[in-house]
């Protein structure tokens, strides 16, 4: 019964949005932001459950990658909209980078930490041991993170970045697809969908994709614009609203799905979904921004980042480095999760250039310290580095 209520509730939010959208029932920016945001929120749940069911038909690692990709589709829609508008109005470039950097930092600082802390609170396990098959995610996250430092250095996002990052994403998906296939254990709404049989579950999945996809497509622009209008109305800095509130709405279903995995004791699936999402955001999402900008602008000119945007990118890259070092030994402890969360929270309130530089340097210093003083972390990081091939003979 609970699963039915979850499904009905999730279906109701995008369905209600269609009524609002086509009748113009919402009044004012707050009402429009609430209605469109709720549609994106509900669609995120539907897409996550559909992607969980996909594990019945494809390798587990690929299913987790697809789950992560689909689960962040709401944020992709909002961020790509900002990048598209930036091609017509350069002021929107700041919002595109704000949403992307905020989403990435929320994913690691809140999502990753919540996964481990839930396992500890519910099952009294002080650490998560990652399966070796998640080396795929860790290796590609290392590659994408290393490349991400080039973006603040050159101060632009260009079509060349799109080509490189899209190639990384495709390589990651292919690598995930070669992983061993395991039959998943489904619970809740995803288990209810799976009970419909092969034809039934695929039909329901297609219906979910159509409903949720349509809701996200029609709600992305109203949500983005109404959020900016709310900031102007209540004198809240628009950059911060877009950086934290927009990704919080679009990524909340993903966080909740990961926490539900953790509550069931499925630690590997919980953190695996979130690490896959981080890879997807650093590759496909970041790569999509200059492509959308170029198409809208009608030229191959790059998106030019100002000083604040470059600092935000650097801070986001530094956080990824620290997170990578933490999980490079395939073990994620309660203490490490608390540190990740504790380092993230001050960023919500300390927004000066000095604070951004300070946080970035602190992440990098802590990562270096762990590598220096932890033999297991040092071995894990060494395994992430490319090795020269030995010549035969």
List each language-model region with its residue ranges:
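Hydrophobic alpha-helical segments, chiefly the membrane-spanning helices
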Residues: 1-393
């Amino acid at each position: 019964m609970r699963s039915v209520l979850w499904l009905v509730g999730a279906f109701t939010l995008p369905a209600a949005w269609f009524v609002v959208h086509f009748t113009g029932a919402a009044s004012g920016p707050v009402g429009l932001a609430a209605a469109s945001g709720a549609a994106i929120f509900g669609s995120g749940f539907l897409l996550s459950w559909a992607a969980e069911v996909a594990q019945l038909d494809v390798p587990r690692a690929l299913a987790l990658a697809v789950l992560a990709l689909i689960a962040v589709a709401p944020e992709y829609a909002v961020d790509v909209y900002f990048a598209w508008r930036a091609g017509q109005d350069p002021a929107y470039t700041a919002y595109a980078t704000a949403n992307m950097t905020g989403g990435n930092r929320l994913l690691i600082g809140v999502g990753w930490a919540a996964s481990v802390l839930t396992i500890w609170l519910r099952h009294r396990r002080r650490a998560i041991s990652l399966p070796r098959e998640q080396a795929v995610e860790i290796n590609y996250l290392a590659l994408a993170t290393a490349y991400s430092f080039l973006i603040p250095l050159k101060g632009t996002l260009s079509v060349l970045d799109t080509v490189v990052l899209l190639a990384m994403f495709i390589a990651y998906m292919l690598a995930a697809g070669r992983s061993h296939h395991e039959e998943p254990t489904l619970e809740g709404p995803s288990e209810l969908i799976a009970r419909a049989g092969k034809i039934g579950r695929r039909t329901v999945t297609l219906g979910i994709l159509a409903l949720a996809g349509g809701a996200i497509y029609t709600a992305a622009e109203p949500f983005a614009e109404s959020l900016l209008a709310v900031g102007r109305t209540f004198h809240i800095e628009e950059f911060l609203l877009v950086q934290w509130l927009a990704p919080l709405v679009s990524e909340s279903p993903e966080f909740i799905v990961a926490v539900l995995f953790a509550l069931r004791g499925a630690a590997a699936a919980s953190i695996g979904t979130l690490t896959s999402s981080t890879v997807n955001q650093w590759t496909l999402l970041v790569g999509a921004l200059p492509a959308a900008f170029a198409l809208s602008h009608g030229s191959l000119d790059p998106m030019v980042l100002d000083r604040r945007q470059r600092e935000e990118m650097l801070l986001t890259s530094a956080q990824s480095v620290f997170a990578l070092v933490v999980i490079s030994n395939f073990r994620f402890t309660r203490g490490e999760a608390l540190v990740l969360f504790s380092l993230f929270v001050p960023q919500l309130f300390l927004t000066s250039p000095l604070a951004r530089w300070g946080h970035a340097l602190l992440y990098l210093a802590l990562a270096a310290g762990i590598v220096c003083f932890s033999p297991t972390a040092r071995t894990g990081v060494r395994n992430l580095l490319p090795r020269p091939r030995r010549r035969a003979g």
